[in-house]
């Protein structure tokens, strides 16, 4: 996984339209609290101009580097508008989701560089942003990750509540915090 992550970082660092990027999946959760097993890499990226052609340029760079995959385009009602889904030569699945809302761009740009694998540092979305993204996604694992972050990580509660409101998961957040005895 380390080789794949290094290559992804190299490509994103040299992709002209990429303003910022940060890990958002299990690796990111493990950067803030006790790591959990994960087999994939999830990244949220912010482009200077979020267009299909700019995203296709990133995909071309990945394919040239030996990744296999495609660009998935969401519909108007989908939370995810553009997502590159690729698999590395190491057989590691990678999802690169592109920010389509202002709050998403903000949490990427506010990412903090953390060592996630020995000798390998990358920006991570801060705990407040991760909790909101996990509540947006809503799977069992996502809610479990959000719960662990709420209980174990250090975060700014007011910032978390503001982000949750902007992402329209504020009621979900309050219910989860109540269930966890955090209110």
Language-model features, listed with the residues they occupy:
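Compositionally biased terminal segments of proteins
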Residues: 1-183
